[in-house]
Amino acid sequence: MGEHPVAEIAEALRSGIEVKDITWIRGTVYKETNPDFEKENSWDEELELLPSFADICRSKELYAQSFLIQYRNTDSVSAKRLAEYYGKNIYVVQNPPAEPLTRIELDDVYELPYQRACHPSYEEEGGVPALREVKFSLTSVRGCFGGCSFCALTFHQGRRIQSRSKDSLLREARLLIEDSEFKGYIHDVGGPTANFRRPSCEKQLRHGVCTHRECLYPTVCPNIEADHSEYIDILRAFIRSGIRFDYMLADQSGGFLRELCEHHISGTLKVAPEHISDNVLKRMHKPDRSVFERFCRKYEAENKRIGKKQYMIPYFISSHPGATLEDACELSVFLKKNGFVPDQVQDFYPTPGTLSTCMFYTGIDPSAKERVYVPSDPEEKRLQRAMLHFNKPENADLVRKALRLLGRTDLIGYGPEALVRPE
């Protein structure tokens, strides 16, 4: 994030240094026009040259290679300077990321006297509707070591967790309560993943995040220090936010799931397994199917123990790179068997800075160095999405078409396993 760089740039400008000479600040990118830049920096082990702009335009393999280098240089401890030759003796140079804020600094940033309102220029149009969803929410953490392929948070906030103090959250909550539009409860307390409140392990603090593996994928790292004790303490003051179920399962105490089910779910828990097919989950960098099924069993058992009828609403993504129509069918069968009715299904669309988008464009998974099937045909994307909402009458024709293409007419009928009725 930009707090440290902005302050350092301001100090440099105040000292009379020209903008073109401010090239040392972490978390910034600058233009280098020295034609001998490569030669003069050939000795620098902390500089890594990316494939040139011309190279990544002509070669998807080099594009994927460039993405992977950038993806592995997002931590302030281990990241190198990166340089890409743009042409005409111009290099784009990216300095290593800024150091994460300390807890005191994070508290200070979020306790500044913000207006908590949209700009007055929007008032004639009725304001900004999206603001209502977040106005009475608290940001508790920054950073995420979840590593989902379709998320750009690794680039924006890094994999190291920074969290605010409970006292700071309470002070901000008191300000929210005083707002004339406050309706009685705080909607959300969290961040990218609410139950990440601390770095994933002690090693991360000393040596930075690992560049050779991720914290939760393909399985939870044995060095993970899953601890929900501080988060549980905060929950006793606030309403539950979104959680990461594989990290919850790594907490051997089991206390967090008990606390969650007993006090912090208002009937339904929203979770995001994203898919069920291991073929797709591999590309998403999400835990495999068995992990979600284990969580479902534990969640059901805990609610039975405390005598509550509480349900689960899963979120899914259709047409993600790697997803075939067969995978969509597998997910539909799972949903039918387990009685899930998806509340939200998002058709994958590419967004800047994500591993999934790199796969979408190149057809290559750079982390696995493998070719990937990309469902880009509009008709197939319609079929995949319809399969996930097979229960909707308006999707019946599309579901039947998909099942016939797959040779799964056994799922068309009136039986308990059928996804759709005949015409």
Where are these regions (language model features)?
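Flexible glycine/acidic-rich beta-alpha junction loops that bind and position SAM and/or redox cofactors
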Residues: 3-14, 29-37, 160, 184-210, ...
